[in-house]
Amino acid sequence: MNVLSCSINTLNGLYDISGVEVGQHFYWKIGGFQVHGQVLITSWVVIAILLASATLAVRNPQTIPTSGQNFFEYVLEFIRDVSKTQIGEEYGPWVPFIGTMFLFIFVSNWSGALLPWKIIQLPHGELAAPTNDINTTVALALLTSVAYFYAGLSKKGLGYFGKYIQPTPILLPINILEDFTKPLSLSFRLFGNILADELVVVVLVSLVPSVVPIPVMFLGLFTSGIQALIFATLAAAYIGESMEGHH
């Protein structure tokens, strides 16, 4: 009975921890569901920035690229290189997915440092980078999970599931657990780094408003770019792994 009671108390404690939220949130009711309004607002802003930038850069393509077109061609070539390195020769269909992930995360991360979200007042909570919310990073990680399952199944059919009993059926639970830990590691790594960066800047601004935060903000911009690259690279690596069938 004591063991059972301790187990129940442990589960209750874990349930309480799972209900803890980081900061206050501004909620919207959409179709009976409660969603974080500030995340949707900032995500729409990021998407609008990406669409507007791409439209302006390629609306009148030139044989000799202009500055904007040249920049986006460089970004596309960079994403192609990352995809080809991680996925292999069949990387082509996955370039749009990897590129979307990289650009959305990159602009989201930078928006937390460059856009004055704090001046927009909300009834509850405050605006911040979309990747500062665990819901966004988990959603991106789940999309990646769907992508690599789809890649494996489309390439190998039901034979894809044979990887779970390789090299021995004894490893079946571990191999299954590995596929669940991939999205967890992706989401928490991105969320933790972006949240920590913004918290450090806020604390330093409150202590020394004009001097110390500047180098920290530049470091944050560099870190934000690295996090976007890591996420996109790992997503491509997982897709390539599912298509090749080896670890």
Swiss-Prot record:
SUPFAM superfamilies: F1F0 ATP synthase subunit A
Signal peptide boundaries: none
Protein localization: Plastid, Chloroplast thylakoid membrane
GO molecular function: proton-transporting ATP synthase activity, rotational mechanism
Domain of life according to the entry: Eukaryota
Residue ranges of the TM segments: 38-58, 95-115, 134-154, 199-219, 220-240
Keyword Transport in record: yes
Coiled-coil ranges from the UniProt annotation: none
Keywords carried by this UniProt record: ATP synthesis, CF(0), Chloroplast, Hydrogen ion transport, Ion transport, Membrane, Plastid, Thylakoid, Transmembrane, Transmembrane helix, Transport
Membrane topology recorded in Swiss-Prot or TrEMBL: Multi-pass membrane protein
GO cellular component, one term: chloroplast thylakoid membrane
Family matches, as InterPro entries: ATP_syn_F0_a_bact/chloroplast, ATP_synth_F0_asu, ATP_synth_F0_asu_AS, F0_ATP_A_sf
Family: Belongs to the ATPase A chain family.
Assembly information from the UniProt record: F-type ATPases have 2 components, CF(1) - the catalytic core - and CF(0) - the membrane proton channel. CF(1) has five subunits: alpha(3), beta(3), gamma(1), delta(1), epsilon(1). CF(0) has four main subunits: a, b, b' and c.
PANTHER family: ATP SYNTHASE SUBUNIT A, CHLOROPLASTIC (PTHR42823:SF3)
Function: Key component of the proton channel; it plays a direct role in the translocation of protons across the membrane.
Protein's recorded name: ATP synthase subunit a, chloroplastic
